[in-house]
């Protein structure tokens, strides 16, 4: 199947190429970049040297000849291409936030008017597999909402409050140079940011509601002195005391058939470079608070890997094709 990657020069685009090179059904025929058009893909993705022989082109959607497309462009840019890809019948997974939320919530959260809105399934396969299976366009979730939602999903509807505390590697901020991600500011430091108003919070609230939860949902992110990975600690407060055996059964039943969720101690070293989400939890003695911890690689399960997982479901491939690999440890 011929694949086009629109916006392939960023970190997520590079990881997408890395994964697709091992996918037996995928052939990357187009990789676009406005700033690098005419140069080899390996000019900035040096780790792919000798593995791909392709030059970047300008993102001209009308002339893309592919069976499937990945939109890996920034928020507000994806809406320029999404409708055209749909019109041409090219199945697509979109990495941006442009189609993750209802129009009014998106416009309030991102401060822009949506120029080409349509509804799309929200691509956490563990929650929305059937919608993804029948879709021609899927909105790939944000990295923070992926790890957070999976941590709490089995018990979300039993909670009155869910508080997510996430810590992320700096690659989540993208490859643009900024003071926030400047080495002296990040090294040997942990930086909370957007403490009460991160733009991924509406996605977390949306998915909690989808799971039947009426809980108040809160979120605070922190920046880690690491390249990859997100550790999320979910404080889940229940309406009434719970028994540990019941909690264990809820998690085991919810994830028993999920190829990329593992119930084991959540550590960045266990998932780095992989599409796995590792989850463990402890129940407070009085049974009213569950602390669930999840670990994902923000560029894989939080971006490129989940996008490939969604593509596999949309196209009827083995769901794990191209992303069946362990984490890199040590």
From Swiss-Prot:
It comes from the Archaea. It holds the Pfam family Semialdhyde_dh. Coiled coil: none annotated. GO terms for cellular component: cytoplasm. Its EC number is 1.2.1.38. Keywords: Amino-acid biosynthesis, Arginine biosynthesis, Cytoplasm, NADP, Oxidoreductase. The keyword Amino-acid biosynthesis applies. GO terms for molecular function: N-acetyl-gamma-glutamyl-phosphate reductase activity; NAD binding; NADP+ binding. Its main location: cytoplasm. Catalyzes the NADPH-dependent reduction of N-acetyl-5-glutamyl phosphate to yield N-acetyl-L-glutamate 5-semialdehyde. Belongs to the NAGSA dehydrogenase family. Type 1 subfamily. This is N-acetyl-gamma-glutamyl-phosphate reductase. It comes from Methanocorpusculum labreanum (strain ATCC 43576 / DSM 4855 / Z). The gene is argC.
